[in-house]
């Protein structure tokens, strides 16, 4: 995208603010950008993302969120596989560099890995690349996921911006895949790799990682831009196991889960708006916390020792 373009909606006719926004985006108008790099998307401190909102709530807190936002961490190897699968399935994502090594034991392998990181690409060992190919193939062969991700049938990695009407906080999302499903309905798709994809494991993962809040936020953003046509949009998680045979499990959350997710987002937006307004980003508690044992531990010890 041209440097003389709004970094949110891509408009080139200006004028632009000091933050690189056009007048429409500065005034809170919704918009989207196709082709925005992931680095540019995540570097935006004028908007809040779903992961940012989740980080503001327990077990996180505003102080930790602000520190992490202002001090981005280096890429972690445990995310490399997922990033590479995204690129293979979606046709969009970080570039992958397949290194001619079986491990990172040798100095040459470590230097090649570090060089790839420096160049902003994802380094993979040969066997990791073979795994990525097998995982992508399993997605393509799935009777529902395969057609869902059919090349040319959707939009990958669109960056979407809007303003929350209650708090006036500027929000952003970046759906993995936007898929028109006929008769004007939109399907918002998120592809995730996981250790296990059985229903019990996915229930725990959704709650522990706040995926119900993510789904609600992405649906809200899609509707704010009117991308959903004349029907309510759907949000589908495509979970894939990282172990053979790389099972694929598609999940749509029920109404109570989405309602609770939206409620979490509303509270996090209020917290964020207050922190931005006051400049105060609190931790957990500035006073002494009176801390009991977890209920399960107290019950177990009472039965054992009292």
Model-identified regions with their sequence ranges:
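Metal-dependent nuclease catalytic cores that hydrolyze phosphodiester bonds in DNA/RNA
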Residues: 28-172, 286, 290, 303
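Short histidine-centered catalytic/ligand-binding loop motif
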Residues: 70-74, 117-124, 199-210, 254-256
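Metal-dependent nuclease catalytic regions and adjoining charged, substrate-binding loops involved
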Residues: 207-212, 217-306
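A residue-level signal for conserved active-site and pocket-lining positions in enzyme catalytic cores
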Residues: 86, 177, 265
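Cysteine-rich micro-motifs
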Residues: 17-28
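Conserved catalytic cores of phosphodiester-cleaving nucleases, focusing on short active-site segments
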Residues: 173-204
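Flanking scaffold residues of small Cys/His-coordinated metal-binding clusters
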Residues: 1-4, 17
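Short cysteine-rich clusters marking metal-coordination/redox-active sites
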Residues: 6-9, 22
């Amino acid at each position: 995208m041209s440097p003389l373009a709004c970094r949110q909606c891509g408009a080139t006719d200006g004028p632009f603010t000091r933050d690189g926004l056009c007048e429409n985006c500065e005034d809170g108008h919704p918009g989207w950008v196709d082709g925005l790099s992931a680095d540019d998307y995540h570097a935006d401190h004028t908007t809040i993302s779903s992961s940012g909102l989740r980080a503001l709530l327990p077990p996180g807190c505003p102080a930790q969120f602000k520190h992490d936002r202002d001090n981005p961490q280096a890429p972690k190897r445990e995310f490399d596989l997922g990033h590479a699968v995204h690129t293979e399935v979606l046709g969009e994502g970080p570039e992958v560099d397949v290194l001619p090594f079986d491990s990172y034991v040798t100095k040459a392998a470590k230097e090649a890995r570090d060089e790839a990181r420096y160049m902003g690409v994802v380094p993979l060992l040969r066997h990791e690349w073979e795994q990525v190919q097998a995982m992508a193939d399993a997605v393509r062969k799935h009777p529902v996921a395969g057609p869902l991700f059919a090349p040319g049938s959707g939009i990958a990695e669109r960056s979407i911006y809007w303003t929350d009407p209650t708090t006036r906080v500027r929000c952003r999302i970046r759906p993995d895949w936007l898929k028109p499903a006929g008769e004007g309905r939109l399907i918002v798709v998120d592809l995730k790799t996981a250790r296990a994809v059985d229903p019990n494991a996915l229930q725990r993962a959704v709650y522990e990682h706040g995926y119900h809040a993510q789904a609600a936020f992405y649906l809200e953003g899609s509707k704010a831009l009117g991308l959903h046509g004349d029907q309510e949009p759907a949000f589908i998680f495509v979970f894939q196991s990282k172990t053979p045979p790389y099972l694929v499990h598609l999940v749509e959350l029920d109404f109570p889960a989405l309602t609770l997710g939206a409620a979490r987002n509303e509270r996090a937006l209020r917290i964020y708006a207050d922190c931005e307004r006051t400049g105060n980003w609190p931790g957990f508690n500035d006073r002494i916390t009176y801390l009991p044992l977890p209920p399960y531990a107290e019950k177990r010890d009472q039965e054992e020792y009292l």
